A protein has these predicted regions:
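Conserved mid-core segment of classical short-chain dehydrogenase/reductases
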Residues: 2-6, 10-15, 19-26, 33-56, ...
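A glycine/serine/threonine-rich, flexible loop-to-helix segment
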Residues: 99, 120, 130-155
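Short-chain dehydrogenase/reductase
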Residues: 18, 70, 111-112, 167-170, ...
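Catalytic loop of short-chain dehydrogenase/reductase
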Residues: 36-71, 75, 79-120, 132-134
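Short, small/polar-rich loop/turn modules that mediate ligand/substrate recognition or access, typified
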Residues: 119, 124, 181-183
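Conserved SDR Rossmann-fold cofactor-binding beta-strand/turn motif
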Residues: 124-134, 174-177
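C-terminal substrate-recognition "lid" of short-chain dehydrogenase/reductases
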Residues: 26, 76, 159-183
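Structural signature of beta-strand start/N-cap positions in the alpha/beta core
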Residues: 27, 82, 124-126, 179
């Protein structure tokens, strides 16, 4: 069995996931966290209209899940292992991103604290903030086409990042080539 399911909203499933991984493979070298969620209807309009329920659920799935996954993964991670997550533009208020911008800001802060906490175990913690990428998740953001075009026009390389660019960066960050790179 090469795949396991895990609902990151349920702590017991996160704990069980890493028990299952440990029983299958023993130790692990890395984890890539690529999890995010928000109610699509709350991404457009004003952030001010974010509901408490969506805020809490979005924060749990998009941010806290990385902390919980890191905690459990670090118990079975080899020395010089790597924890990696994906983020996007948390320093500016992006139209039609709303609560996800807040979640990504919290996620990026979490990366720093996890890097500090796990550095003594020689576990690296990093995040890739690649910019807007054409994915199914990104299609939920209103005006995504405008965002891609604006980014392409204003990037130094005059092009958008694609999934292959992100994959190459991820390979570097989870490999020993980045042995001294954390946060």
């Amino acid at each position: 069995k090469l795949t396991f399911s895990c609902d990151v909203e349920k702590k017991d499933e996160v704990v069980q996931l890493f028990k299952d991984v440990k029983s299958k493979w023993g130790e692990i070298d890395f984890v890539v966290h690529a999890v995010a969620f928000s109610d699509k209807s709350e991404l457009s309009g004003e952030y001010l209209n974010t509901t408490r329920e969506n805020f809490l659920r979005s924060m749990l799935i998009s941010c806290f899940s990385f902390t919980e996954v890191s905690k459990e993964a670090s118990k079975i991670m080899k020395e010089e292992g790597s924890l990696l997550t994906l983020t996007y533009e948390s320093t500016k208020a992006i139209p039609n991103y709303n609560v996800m911008g807040v979640c990504k800001s919290a996620l990026e802060a979490s990366v720093k604290y996890l890097a500090r906490d796990l550095g003594g175990k020689k576990i690296r913690v990093n995040a890739i903030s690649a910019g807007p990428i054409k994915t199914l998740a990104a299609s939920a953001i209103g005006d995504a086409k405008f965002l891609y075009k604006w980014n392409e026009d204003h990037s130094f390389l005059k092009r958008n990042v694609d999934i292959h660019d992100v994959g190459n960066s991820a390979l570097y960050l989870i490999s020993n080539l980045s042995a001294c790179v954390t946060c």
